[in-house]
Amino acid sequence: MPQALPATIVATHLERIRRSVPLTHVITNDVVTGFTANVLLALGAAPAMITAPEEAGSFAAIASVLSVNVGTLTSAQAATIRIAVQSANQAGTPWVLDPVAAGVLPYRTELCRELLQQHPAAIRGNASEIMALAGQAAAGKGVDSANQSDQAIEAAQVLAKSSGAIVAVTGEIDYITDGERVVSIKAGDPLMTRVTGTGCALSSVVAAFIAGCEEKDRLDAVASACAVMAIAGQRAAAKAKGPGSFVPAFLDNLYLLDAVTIAEALA
């Protein structure tokens, strides 16, 4: 049975991020780079979008955390990802995988399955992506899921156990698991799906939240990342007229989040 996450835990992890300002190495897709950087800055992290293969390994070794997203994958980016992940592992830098459209396109699916063997600290995806990586039948529409998040809870648990990662399957309700315990986050707003990048940015926020976090606390950290994004989205949508006004309102609400607003949203 999924558990709710106490608001105090979310607030504690958010305060830790703002205090520590984790250097977050982001290798993401071309569509969302700027938005992702702004989301991280609004929350208090320090994004660095280092993508050159000549630099990615060196930077992953000194970063607080690495976030990998395969959304607009090319062979050159795949090489960069492999270099960065190997360097991160050698340096003890935790890293997060966002397996965009895994299970839909063979090339990226093969790369994601290869990366599963490289010990990601967390995996964040939609239901279809998580089900595909867990070896279950899934229905995806390009980068979008044709499965509901609750349909992927079992797959997320299987994937968490096989990979050793915390797995977050996101949708109308987010489910986060370490293979045994399952936490659910019910917040957010449908307007979040009408702008590009909220899911991809979430994966980098997950990375920032696990930076400097003890392994035993990673489940709560990942769930807290999902919670702050959902809460900010919900609050922004309440005042936005549409996608155009939603984005700046969303960034503002990430910046303004505090223990009181978190408690109100999760009450």
Swiss-Prot record:
Alphabetical UniProt keywords: ATP-binding, Kinase, Magnesium, Metal-binding, Nucleotide-binding, Thiamine biosynthesis, Transferase
Cofactor(s) essential for the protein: Mg(2+)
Molecular function GO terms recorded: ATP binding; hydroxyethylthiazole kinase activity; magnesium ion binding
Biological process (GO), any one: thiamine biosynthetic process
Gene from which this protein is expressed: thiM
CDD domains registered for this protein in UniProt: THZ_kinase (cd01170)
Pfam families: HK
EC number: 2.7.1.50
Positions with a binding annotation for substrate: 49, 197
Function text: Catalyzes the phosphorylation of the hydroxyl group of 4-methyl-5-beta-hydroxyethylthiazole (THZ).
Intrachain disulfide bonds: none
Pathways involved: Cofactor biosynthesis; thiamine diphosphate biosynthesis; 4-methyl-5-(2-phosphoethyl)-thiazole from 5-(2-hydroxyethyl)-4-methylthiazole: step 1/1
Protein's name according to its UniProt entry: Hydroxyethylthiazole kinase
